[in-house]
């Protein structure tokens, strides 16, 4: 028996805004394709001309590339396939699978109003549906028809959803779907079916807001002689207030997270856990995620966005990152703050010093400003307030001890220990005034590590100014 070659797709509408919930809908089909050594296709559903733009498509592609979600085929644009859709519609009409409907919008609205008044489900009544022995109304002059699909009468549509289990929808609940508008433009549900058939999609992994579209798509697919793919409908992603995540509800875009100093691997790790799990694993690599990913590990309950958890994850990734790679990622943020990373202390060393405390790349850049700023020009009042006369002798001895240091963290630590023992004082009593003398602040990483980055000569020069 031949092994199925897995083909999945992500098919967004290019509206110019892509949030974490959107990206999760891309991540799972991407991971499933990669896990099974299959193909991942990017399809752009851009038939809504008023809302679609190339700039919006670029936002999607950039967001996926930033997270490392590579594509095998695409982007494929639906608007470039219009001729294909029209050809299939023509074939369906000729085969009796679809038909022109001349019911006007006004007539349709009146029908719906009447049905609702009778407490019936609003639906098309099949007026123009051709049946053996049925007389159709006369075709009105000057009216362009829509094309409707002849939905099966009786029976049910049944599919075994990989997330939700077996779902059954009666055909009596479905009316004859419009598959082409009066101007010939094909509609969403029809285009999706033709695309999935042409692209040989084996697994459709998407949000559960598409569940109601699925029976219609299955019926059209079967009418065209195709076999439905495996469907996996993902529960909704809720924002931190329990509402559906959307731009309207204040969701941040992917670009917002980039600008806020989040690492792509942290975002990907976080997205993976929004509806999927592998035991108790919280922090894992992209490679581990792909290796572990299975559809039967997807959750059935809505996932809720937790900004604090995302920030915690970002901290974990920053803390464990290689300092050189992290420095490259930090440079744009440092440059925005006016830091010249090529002049002054070694930027990789600075980042290595700051990364254990930082939650974002912005925090690292903010911390780095200390090391690239000119020496603080402290006033007499500032010195008096922050550096007591009693500690000055210890500071003078520290300057002498530092002159013998060899620039290593260990040698600086030894210099401090020597002075602490000599003056019978505790580390905070000496470290706090040293920090203030060096940077005009008492909040810095470990002082011996700070001295490695700042450099012995610069440290001695700054300390000398406060003990004159």
From Swiss-Prot:
Single GO cellular component term: cytosol
Q: Predominant location of this chain?
A: cytoplasm
Tell me which Pfam families the record gives: Anticodon_2, tRNA-synt_1c
**Catalytically driven reaction(s):** tRNA(Glu) + L-glutamate + ATP = L-glutamyl-tRNA(Glu) + AMP + diphosphate
Which UniProt keyword terms apply here?
Aminoacyl-tRNA synthetase, ATP-binding, Cytoplasm, Ligase, Nucleotide-binding, Protein biosynthesis
What GO molecular-function term can you cite, just one? glutamate-tRNA ligase activity
Binding, ATP: 247
Q: Which HAMAP family match?
A: Glu_tRNA_synth_type1
Q: Which NCBIfam families match?
A: gltX_bact (TIGR00464)
Name it. Glutamate--tRNA ligase
**Organism of provenance:** Polynucleobacter asymbioticus (strain DSM 18221 / CIP 109841 / QLW-P1DMWA-1) (Polynucleobacter necessarius subsp. asymbioticus)
Q: Quick one: which gene encodes this?
A: gltX
């Amino acid at each position: 028996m031949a092994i199925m070659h897995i083909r999945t797709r992500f098919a967004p509408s290019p509206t110019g805004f892509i949030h974490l919930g959107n990206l999760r809908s891309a991540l799972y089909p991407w991971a499933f394709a990669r896990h099974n050594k299959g193909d991942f296709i990017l399809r752009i559903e851009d038939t809504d001309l008023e809302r679609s733009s190339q700039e919006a498509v670029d936002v999607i592609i950039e967001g996926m590339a930033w997270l490392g979600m590579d594509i095998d085929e695409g982007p494929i644009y639906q608007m470039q396939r219009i001729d294909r859709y029209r050809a299939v519609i023509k074939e369906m009409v000729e085969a009796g699978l679809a038909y022109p409907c001349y019911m006007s919008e006004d007539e349709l609205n009146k029908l719906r109003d009447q049905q609702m008044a009778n407490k019936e489900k609003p639906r098309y009544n099949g007026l123009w549906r051709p049946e053996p022995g049925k007389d159709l109304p006369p075709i009105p002059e000057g009216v362009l028809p829509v094309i409707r699909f002849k939905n099966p009468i009786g029976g049910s549509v049944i599919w075994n959803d990989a997330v939700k289990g077996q779902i059954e929808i009666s055909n009596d609940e479905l009316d004859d779907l419009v598959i082409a508008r009066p101007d010939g433009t094909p509609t969403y549900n029809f285009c999706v079916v033709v695309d999935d058939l042409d692209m040989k999609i084996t697994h459709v992994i998407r949000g559960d807001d598409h569940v109601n579209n699925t029976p219609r798509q299955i019926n059209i697919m079967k009418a065209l002689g195709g076999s439905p793919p495996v469907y996996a409908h993902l529960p909704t992603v809720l924002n931190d207030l329990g509402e559906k995540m959307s731009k309207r509800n204040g969701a941040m875009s992917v670009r917002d997270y980039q600008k806020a100093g989040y690492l792509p691997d942290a975002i990907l790790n976080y997205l993976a856990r929004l509806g999927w799990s592998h035991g108790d694993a919280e922090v894992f690599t992209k490679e581990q995620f792909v290796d572990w990913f299975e559809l039967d590990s997807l959750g059935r309950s809505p996932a809720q966005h937790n900004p604090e958890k995302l920030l915690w994850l970002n901290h974990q990734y920053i803390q464990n990152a290689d300092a050189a790679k992290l420095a490259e990622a930090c440079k744009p943020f440092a440059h925005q703050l006016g830091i010249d990373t090529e002049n002054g202390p070694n930027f990789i060393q600075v980042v290595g010093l700051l990364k254990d405390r930082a939650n974002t790349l912005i925090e690292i850049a903010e911390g780095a400003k200390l090391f690239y700023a000119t020496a603080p020009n402290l006033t007499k009042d500032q010195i008096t307030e922050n550096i007591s006369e009693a500690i000055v002798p210890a500071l003078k001895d520290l300057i002498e001890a530092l002159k013998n240091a060899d620039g290593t963290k260990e040698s600086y630590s030894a210099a401090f220990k020597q002075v602490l023992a000599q003056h019978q004082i505790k580390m905070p009593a000496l470290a706090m005034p040293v920090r203030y003398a060096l940077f005009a602040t008492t909040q810095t990483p470990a002082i011996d590590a700070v001295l490695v980055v700042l450099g012995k000569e610069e440290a001695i020069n700054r300390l000398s100014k406060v003990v004159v």
